[in-house]
Amino acid sequence: MYPAQNGDAFLLSTNKTNILIDGGYSSTFNSYIQKDLKELAARNACLNLVIITHIDADHIGGIIRLLASNGDSNVKNIISIEDVWHNSLRSLTSVNQTALPPEDLEVIDAIIKRGHPKEFSSLPSFNEISARQGSTLATLIKAGGYVWNRTDGTQSICTDSVQVKQFQDGLVRVLTPSRARLNSLIKSWQQDLRRYGFTGPVGTNQAIDDAFELNFEHSNKVKAKGEILISAGCNKSLEEIYKPDDSPTNASSIATIIELDGIRLLMLADALAEDILMEVQRLKSQGEVMMFDAIKISHHGSNYNTSPELLSVIDAPRYFISSDGSKHNHPDIELLRAIVDREASFTRTLYFNYSTPESREIRDFQATTGATFIVEENATSWIEITKEQSC
C-alpha cells in the first residue's frame, strides 16, 4: 500500500504474479512505485495486470506517469505489462464519431485544453503546465500498443462481460461495475456535454475519448458528499448516518476478489456498497465464504461506501485504509468504529498508510462487543499476508 496522499495505489506480489491496482498521483509513481517495478523487472518479472479502477486523478496519475515512462509495450523501459484494465469511452460505446461540426469541436477542444486538474501532479517541483497538458490514460494505452481490457480496449471490464481472469497461482474475479453502471456513466457524460453546449450525437474518437477522461477528472472534485456533517463529539453510529454514494464515477469502479497463492483479497476501489453487497450475497448463496484474508476498504474509508449491511456479510483479519485525510476528511471515524466493533474470534488489524486524526482516535476506542483490534499507521512497507495468520 503506497503513500498516495488522498489516493489509492496497491502492488500485489507473489512469486508468480504481480498486480498493480491504481497509481495514486504522478509523485506516487516517481517516489515509490517506479523503484519497486524496476526491482521486479530486474528479476525478470512483469506486471501481469494493471487495474485502473475508475477515472479519478488520485487513482490514475501514477499510471499515466508509468505508461509515459515505460514507452511502447515492446520497448518497456521500466517493466513488461501483460494486460491493462481501464474503462475509457472507447470501452463503453461502439458509436464512432468521425467528424464533428465546428461548434461541437469547440466544446471538445475546450475540455481538452483545460487539461488535468492542477493537483494531478502533487510533486511541488513538477512543472504544472506539463502535468495539465499531458496525455490521457486512454491515449497512452492505445499509442503504446498495450493489451487493453484483454484485447484492444473496445470491450469493457464489467460483470456482464468479464467475470474471471486466471493466473498461474490464482485469479481475479470482477465484482463491479455492471453494464448498467457503465451506461449511467455514459449518460452522465452526455448530460455534461449538453450542458457545455454540445448539440450533435455523442460518439467516440480519440479527441472525444480524451475529453471524456479529463472531464471526469475535474467533475470528481466538485462534490464531496456528506463530509464534515457529523461533529466529532456526536459519536453517532454508521447505521444512523449511512447514505449511499451517488457518484457515477465511483459506481463505475472495478472492484475485485483477488486470489493468489491461496490468499483471498477483497479490493473495493471506490465502489458502492449496494453493488458489492449484491455480488457478495450472490457468491455466498453459491457456497463461497465471505471471510477474506484482507479487505481494502472502499473510497478511502468514507461513511458512504461501506454500509452496515455489507459489514454484516464480509470480514477479514486485515483492513487497508488508504488516505492522508487531506481531502474530504477520509477516513471517517464512524466507519472505523463499525469495522472493529463486531464480534470476532480473531484480532483485526487496521492498516493505514498515514497517521490521521481518525487513525489516532480509533486507537483509543473500546469495542462494546469485546472484539480486539490493532492499529498500524504509516503502513507503506511490504505487508506479508499468510494464511496461517488468517481465520
Where are these regions (language model features)?
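Conserved beta-strand hairpin/beta-sheet module of binuclear metal-dependent hydrolase folds
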Residues: 1-46, 248-274
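C-terminal regulatory/interaction regions
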Residues: 5-8, 259-261, 271-292, 309-313, ...
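Active-site environment of divalent metal-dependent phosphoester hydrolases
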Residues: 6-8, 26-28, 55-61, 91-92, ...
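Structural recognition of the beta-strand scaffold that forms the well-ordered cores
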Residues: 11, 18-21, 48-52, 83-87, ...
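Pre-active-site segment of Zn-dependent metallo-hydrolases
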Residues: 19-50, 64-73, 184-190, 196-206, ...
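Active-site metal-binding motif and surrounding structural segment of the metallo-beta-lactamase
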Residues: 31-84, 285-304, 313-320
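Flexible, acidic/histidine-containing loops and adjacent segments that form or flank the divalent-metal
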Residues: 71-264, 353-355, 363-391
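Long, well-ordered mid-to-C-terminal structural blocks that present hydrophobic/aromatic surfaces
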Residues: 240-305
